[in-house]
Amino acid sequence: RNLDLSNMTIIEGKEGITVVDPLVSAETAKVGMDLYYKNRGNKPVVAVIYTHSHVDHYGGVRGVVDEADVKSGKVKVYAPAGFMEAAVAENIMAGNVMSRRASYMYGNLLKPDAKGQVGAGLGTTTSAGTVTLIAPTNIIEKDGQKEVIDGLTYDFMLAPGSEAPSEMLWYIEEKKLIESAEDVTHTLHNTYSLR
């Protein structure tokens, strides 16, 4: 299991690392980065990728990178078309009602022990730290759009309206790696957790 509800992935490239889906909160994402650095060395973050517009996939971004590095162009942030609109609509406009419903779904008001809450189904549970957002610098706008990120070739495929209103998947040619976001999972979490 991970440090948070979602999983953060770190991809080692030619000069540094790309962080995919930096968790729910900055504090938890920073702990994840510290664990990585302790075991793999202090490679710089050169890119962040948001697979989709749900808060558990971007909320910890400021625990991973400094916004000044993004503004200077030192770090690029990639996201699918429609990301900002979907993130705002879901997490600000509908956020209060979704948060209340999530309490029933996750049982986060239960005491965390063997007879109470032992997890949220998808992962441990949502962290309670600072939710952050840094706007994307690079938008993936079409299927088959290729981007070279830190020496690796990413072949993107948009999947809007699949698991989230704005979502994407990709293939990294050099690593023969497929990233399927939350479109391929062991759960049907958007079906049984209607919020």
Segment roles from a protein language model:
Residues 153, 157-195:
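Active-site-proximal loop/helix segments of hydrolase catalytic cores
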Residues 27, 53-59, 84-86, 163-165, ...:
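Active-site environment of divalent metal-dependent phosphoester hydrolases
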Residues 18-24, 48, 191-195:
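Second-shell loop/turn segments in exported
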Residues 78-80, 180:
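Generic beta-sheet signal
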Residues 85-159:
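Metallo-beta-lactamase
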Residues 1-43, 167-182:
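Conserved beta-strand hairpin/beta-sheet module of binuclear metal-dependent hydrolase folds
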Residues 35, 62-68, 92-99, 194-195:
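Short secondary-structure boundary/capping segments
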Residues 15-16, 26-76:
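Active-site metal-binding motif and surrounding structural segment of the metallo-beta-lactamase
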